[in-house]
Amino acid sequence: YGRVINTSSPSGIYGNIGQSNYGAAKAGIAAFTVITAMELAKYNVTVNALVPAALSRMTAGLVGMDNLSDEQKEAMSPRWQAVTAAWLCSEEAAKVTGRCFDVRGDQIGISEGWVLGPTGTQPEDPQDLGPLMTELMSKARLNANMGGHPSGGTGRPENEI
């Protein structure tokens, strides 16, 4: 029996300009979390990761952080990470494993992995994949950090936004 809680980063899940090395390392932590969860399940050990959007000494110098309101600063307090970590260590979370939790203030999300088509299989024809991808993209979080990308970060061409 046990609990492992790793720390990844939004840079490793969603990317951040100028942080390719850091983002790659934190993406590795996310993958490590999923794989070790599989490997340690037989020992009743859960492995999860926090993906914190938190204001700290490390993030204080990032662009835009000095313009945050007091309310935004509170929402990005590291204390929210502690609440999620404590819950992941609880008995209530005994079956939660291999997940990466995006945590920012009163907001929490789960980074999703594989999504299959309506038949439960990957379409073999690109024409058949199109409708599934359109549906998935319509439900996906828009990545506003894709500065300079023609889609403006939506993953869709400008004329379809």
Residue ranges and their predicted role:
Residues 15-19:
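Active-site "substrate specificity/gating" loop of NAD(P)-dependent dehydrogenases
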Residues 43, 50-61:
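Short, flexible catalytic-loop segment of classical short-chain dehydrogenase/reductase
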Residues 14, 30, 35-45, 91-95:
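Active-site-adjacent segment of SDR/Rossmann-fold oxidoreductases
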Residues 12-14, 56:
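Conserved catalytic-site region of short-chain dehydrogenase/reductase
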Residues 22:
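Catalytic tyrosine of NAD(P)H-dependent dehydrogenase/reductases that use a Tyr as the general acid/base
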Residues 9:
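Residue(s) in the substrate-gating loop at a strand-loop-helix junction
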Residues 25:
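Active-site helix of classical SDR
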Residues 49, 68-161:
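C-terminal helical subdomain
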